[in-house]
Amino acid sequence: MSVNGAVWGRVRSRFRAFPEHLAACGAEASAYGKCVQASTAPGGRLSKDLCVREFEALRSCFAAAAKKTMMGGS
């Protein structure tokens, strides 16, 4: 396999794992989504870093889920 093919193989495997990782972080994804939704509702004002706490919680959870998968855990 070419070097370029190996890179795309890793990218595809990460994309295939994305739904699993997201499912493992349902509460965090929901909290972030609710924050963004409330900020974009009529009268709401979405701005940078408005939902940063929720985003960081989701990012941390997602990274932990990805690491767990890479280590062979389920």
Curated annotation (Swiss-Prot):
Q: Where is this motif: Cx9C motif 1?
A: 25-35
- What is the protein's given name? NADH dehydrogenase [ubiquinone] 1 alpha subcomplex assembly factor 8
Keyword check for Disulfide bond: yes
InterPro entries reported for this sequence: NDUFAF8 (IPR034595)
Quaternary form? Interacts with NDUFAF5.
Q: Name one GO biological process term.
A: mitochondrial respiratory chain complex I assembly
What is the protein's known function?
Involved in the assembly of mitochondrial NADH:ubiquinone oxidoreductase complex (complex I, MT-ND1). Required to stabilize NDUFAF5.
Q: In what residue span(s) does the CHCH domain sit?
A: 22-69
Organism, per UniProt?
A: Mus musculus
Q: State the span of motif (Cx9C motif 2).
A: 51-61
Q: Which UniProt keywords apply?
A: Disulfide bond, Mitochondrion
Where does this protein reside within or beyond the cell? Mitochondrion
Which cysteines form disulfides? 25-61, 35-51
**GO cellular component annotations, sorted alphabetically?**
mitochondrial matrix; mitochondrion
Against PANTHER family, the record matches this protein to:
NADH DEHYDROGENASE [UBIQUINONE] 1 ALPHA SUBCOMPLEX ASSEMBLY FACTOR 8 (PTHR34561:SF1)
